[in-house]
Amino acid sequence: AASDCCSACICDRRAPPYFECTCGDTFDHCPAACNKCVCTRSIPPQCRCTDRTQGRCPLTPCA
């Protein structure tokens, strides 16, 4: 749904050494959600949330 937002981030390791950071565990309502996810340059890469939203979910789904 367009109102979905992200509560977790996942690092996709299918194409090393490049890593795609995507949202996981999306819910229709989440009090503290991720609007964006980024991968760190650590080894192994870690996926973390950026641009946190409070209260309402983002109007567009996290990609």
Curated annotation (Swiss-Prot):
This is Bowman-Birk type proteinase inhibitor B-II. Keywords: Disulfide bond, Protease inhibitor, Serine protease inhibitor. Disulfide bonds join C5-C62, C6-C23, C9-C57, C11-C21, C30-C37, C34-C49, C39-C47. Belongs to the Bowman-Birk serine protease inhibitor family. It comes from Arachis hypogaea (Peanut). One of its GO terms (cellular component) is extracellular region. One of its GO terms (molecular function) is serine-type endopeptidase inhibitor activity. One of the interaction site with trypsin probably also interacts with chymotrypsin.
